[in-house]
Amino acid sequence: MTSVHSLGFPRIGHKRELKKALESFWSKEIDEQELQSRAAQLRDRHWKIQQTCGMDFIPVGDFSLYDHMLDMSCTLGAIPPRYGFSGGLVGLDTFFAMARGSSTQPAMEMTKWFDTNYHFIVPEFHENMEFHLSSERLFDQIKEAQALGLKAKPVLVGPITYLWLGKEKDLNAEAHHEAQHHHDDSACHGHGAPVGNACFDRLTLLPKVLPVYAEILERLAGMGVEWVQMDEPALALDLPAEWHQALTSAYQTLSKGKSPKVLLATYFDSVAEHAEALKALPVAGLHLDLRRAPQQLDSFLKNYPADKVLSLGVVDGRNVWRADLDAAIKILEPAHKQLGDRLWVAPSCSLLHTPVDLDQETELDTELKSWLAFSVQKLDEVALIGRALSEGVAAVAQELSTARAAVQSRKTSPRIHNPAVAQRLEGLGKDDGQRKSAFQAREAAQRARFKLPAFPTTSIGSFPQTPEIRKARLQNRKGELSNADYQKAMEAEIALVVKEQERLGIDVPVHGEPERNDMVEYFGEQLAGFAFTRHGWVQSYGSRYVKPPLIFGDVSRPTPMTVTWSKYAQSLTQRPMKGMLTGPVTILQWSFVRDDQPREKTALQIALAIRDEVKDLIDAGIGIIQIDEPAYREGLPLKRKDWDQYLNWASRAFRISAQIAPDDVQIHTHMCYSEFNDILPAIAAMDADVITIETSRSQMELLDAFATFNYPNEIGPGVYDIHSPRVPSVEEMVGLMEKAVKVVPAERLWINPDCGLKTRKWAEVTPALENMVEAAKQVRAKHA
């Protein structure tokens, strides 16, 4: 029999029960015992679902109250000293302080889990750190599963991935530690790249970590556990050679102690270049992601050891489309012929990244629904493939026929393929994606048109989304507020935002985006080729879940999406109103994207739709248009060899969306992250007239990269950290701009906040913007 299993299941619950339990606990409505009771009920339900789907092994330990990497840190006792942990078992207070911060200490850093939209808590390491088994969580959950008669397969983040994803910290800097999102100045970024005086290599901690892993494995063996899954997705990255050597020595060390059989799981990309080393590891099996990297199978089947299991992920754990079961079975047949029962079938990776259960979607039309599979349905697919291999395809002929019909329907449906969109794409030439003139000519035309002062001020787009705004939007959605009354309410809010910016003296105002719920959903709801679910939630981090749109077909823009609002806002002021759009790459990155054509093609379709909107904004008299691309860097492939191809089409998609703008229309873009150095040529290739970036937290250090690269266009470095409720002083902002003037010519600088102001309160925003405008006046007086 071919064994079937899952690498992990969503934690959130069918009705987001985990979120509700966490928020009730944080607001002290329930106690720890009740929180743990609800968590146990969720685990029980999720395990039984997987058992009902026919899984031979049930993952245990994949469930977390916040994040599995944070769980691993607590299990290993890797607790930063600032949380006051004094040994023993890590309590829930410490766990949540690390995740969310406390009244006295900031949270640990959070960043994206490889190239997914899930965020993990980044482990912090210091040179003399000691590791001890500091949590009973995993063993308690194994007992729960065994009490239900389940064949539990514990899931652990492996030692190489755990250390690779962490950061070295200088303990002396802890006293000055500030909460920073996505970067920390006291970290060694990447392997062997010392920053500050934290210049030790975290790989040197491996000999200290391994005894704790060995202790965990020994205890699991003592509990009668047959298999343990060690996740090592970092092997799909471009790891330095010494890390690969460390992998071999680490697993050799672990193999010497008592242990269940180890299934080493890789996913998210190919590990074919390390096939020989991985096959030689003293583990009982390997898992490969054949959705992301089907071509790697041959390297592993060649001389695959006769004593090892090979688990193959053929059902996509990261997207929502129904599997082509015939194709999956065909891929697996040679492996099944060679390996027999040593072949296991699984999803490509943990199902953490897909919604829970398609059966909840009662409002999706039958045709579209037939093309989809959420986590529960994906396990059904895995089980079906396993049966087809074990019993022959005749045993599952009816199920295969149903799946085949759905796949065929998706291939041929007129809802998917729009000839007009195909024609537009085919019509794109090499010159498409180039503005009419070079930046110098555009800059001159824009200065003549707008006559802005030196160091012009603007904001990034959104203004505070008050409870009144959210209430009006909800009432409108429910039909309790007519469209006409909703429009009046939003216009009143826009008028207030514009008036406030006039009073403050902001040179390039925005309309504040009160009508927008989310920067991707707002556009997706108005574009053809998109669909939305009611319950398609996935975890972003902790208790924050997102419901990505589904891009199922060719994308086009039936009618203008933002023009009415921008035109109204411009009618209220003589100053140039900035139009606000979300860029093609960000819309792509934050959606479930169709898998029947290259992502590049979908990005270009979205770019053409955005270009239509840019044209209509220009025709309506809007002369400054921002096309946001906060997710531009997130799309980077895991391996550097694949970067150029992605960056070429991503920058082209942006240029196509902006290309229609004449010289005197100024195109802005906005990005917010901490690492620009390695993609600056691609950012320059976007050819936006102005780029605004998040720099206040790094004290303008990010600008050094732009200066070294000699970035040719205008830059608005953020001087107001909108992630904090703190109001920065005039002196602080002037100080930041003085740093900026040292590395970027004064005539190319703008002054703006780091990001949109949507999450802040008016009581914070008003004084902060007043100080920003005053800072601009002082910097102008000195440098203009």
Located regions from the model:
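Domain-level signal for soluble alpha/beta catalytic cores
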Residues: M1-A784
